[in-house]
Amino acid sequence: LTQFMQATAYVRFKPDTEERSTYLYRAYTKWCEDNLESPVPQKKFSQFLLKNAGKYGLTFSKHIEGKYRGFRGVCVHPAFAAAYSNSTF
């Protein structure tokens, strides 16, 4: 998971951004596919993000786009988010 968090082609850390947990996990599974890694389950992925939020400057929120769970301070490449995402990659 640490290697994924450093993969700037998939995820970027910016204080004024936010991303749904679903989109973060989608980017992670694509990274795993591209790097021949086996992904951890989504629950374990989310637990990792919560546990390491301070290390990456993330803040958990239940109100991403008004109704989704996710994190502030991060965005994913637009290919991993829906067309209407607020991603500013």
Walk through the language-model features, giving the residues of each:
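Short alpha-helical segments that sit at the start of domains
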Residues: 1-5
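Positively charged interface segments
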Residues: 10-89
